[in-house]
Amino acid sequence: MYQLGDVKKIVLPGDPVEVQGKIRNGIYRGPDNKYYSEYFGTLQVSDQYVDVVPFSGQYIPRKGDKVIGKIIEVGPSTWTVDINSPYFAMLHMNDTPWRISSGDLKRYLNSGDYVYAKIMSVNEIKESWLTLKEPGLKKLEGGHMVLIHASRVPRVIGKGGGMVNMVKELTSTRIIIGQNGLIWIDGPIEGVTMAIAAIEMIEREAHTEGLTVRVESFLKELRGDKDGNQQDKANQ
């Protein structure tokens, strides 16, 4: 059972990694056909994938931050939440908008569910507690998740929210950005696909100037290509 203060398994470059699902990031196969870690970071294991996330790409929790987290364990009165940090966060049933009886937590949030929550406290060793008891905080239903480097979040949001609002408008999607680098996107599949491509572009080119204009042109070109193809079919 995970408890407050538990740390994910830390691996070093070259450490052997047991792989039972698909490998995604930070793992390579050696000449002996065994798998090894590529980074100094934490081992992330799910039912389908195994990753090693480098410490340089992980989020350090701060009081007041709004984050997206994944429920990974349900206890009698608390949920354990993965917030893309070396430490797991905790959510107590009293810090939700629901009236919950102890032991009945799975009716509201189960393993694999995502929440948009606020960090209400962090201690000196970065153990954190979450809350859902503020407007806008909630369980996230449906949608698609994208993970970016937490340091790129301000660039995705843009000055005064300009960048993300432009992406939402041009893709007809709803987007919620966690300050820990997790982003939730919902809407028509075409729009979601375009929004993901735009966010990946922003992360990749975050250090460059004139990015807002390029992202806008990129999305308009994608929309124009789609509209153009539909027009061609209509004229046939």
Curated annotation (Swiss-Prot):
Q: This protein's superkingdom?
A: Archaea
> Which Gene3D superfamilies does this chain map to?
2.40.50.100, K Homology domain, type 1, Nucleic acid-binding proteins
CDD domains in the cross-refs: KH-I_Rrp4_prokar (cd22524), S1_Rrp4 (cd05789)
Keyword flag Cytoplasm: yes
Chief subcellular site?
Answer: cytoplasm
- Every copy of the S1 motif domain together lies at 64-133
Q: Cite the entry's keywords alphabetically.
A: Cytoplasm, Exosome, RNA-binding
Tell me the GO molecular function terms. poly(A) binding
Say if the entry is tagged with keyword Oxidoreductase.
Answer: no
Pfam families in UniProt: KH_1 (PF00013), RRP4_S1 (PF21266)
Q: Name one GO cellular component term.
A: cytoplasm
A Gene Ontology annotation in the biological process aspect, one of them, is: U4 snRNA 3'-end processing
SMART domains listed in its UniProt record:
KH
Domain KH, residue spans: 141-199
Q: Where in the cell is it found?
A: Cytoplasm
Which PANTHER family has this protein been placed in? EXOSOME COMPLEX COMPONENT RRP4, PNAS-3 RELATED
Q: Subunit info? A: Component of the archaeal exosome complex. Forms a trimer of Rrp4 and/or Csl4 subunits. The trimer associates with a hexameric ring-like arrangement composed of 3 Rrp41-Rrp42 heterodimers.
The entry's function note states: Non-catalytic component of the exosome, which is a complex involved in RNA degradation. Increases the RNA binding and the efficiency of RNA degradation. Confers strong poly(A) specificity to the exosome.
Report the sequence similarity comment from the record: Belongs to the RRP4 family.
Alphabetical list of HAMAP family matching this protein? Exosome_Rrp4
The protein depicted here goes by the name: Exosome complex component Rrp4
Q: Which organism is it from?
A: Thermoplasma volcanium (strain ATCC 51530 / DSM 4299 / JCM 9571 / NBRC 15438 / GSS1)
